[in-house]
Amino acid sequence: MSGAPETAQAALRDFGERIGSAFQLADDIIDVVSTREKLGKAPGTDLREGVPTLPGLVALASARPEDGRLVELLSRPLTDDREHAEGLALLRAHPSLERSYAYVHQEADAARALLVDLPDIPARVALESLCDAVVTRSA
């Protein structure tokens, strides 16, 4: 980056923030939808520990009357295995998951848009590929 124009430096800094956010939010989704085999650990770790995640926050913000049990389970850590499994199943079936995926795609698209004024060189192509990888990864 040394010697790069200030506009390029700013674009890359902003890109890093956006793609980093998209990566973390995708990780939130993966923790809900993935399997032990793919993750190498039990899914729903954040849910078990009561850590706020994008799918959970979206579910709380868009809770419907029939989501009472999910809202209750999202309000605390789920150390009980049965409650954890129930919470995970409810969250997997909730429309918040679709909205969360859409938001991650928006963040990755916003990151990609920051690259448009950069030179068309292999590094830019690699960063654009990173945008795709962030939204398609499963573990």
Functional labels for PLM-detected ranges:
Residues 1-139:
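All-alpha prenyltransferase/terpene-synthase fold signal
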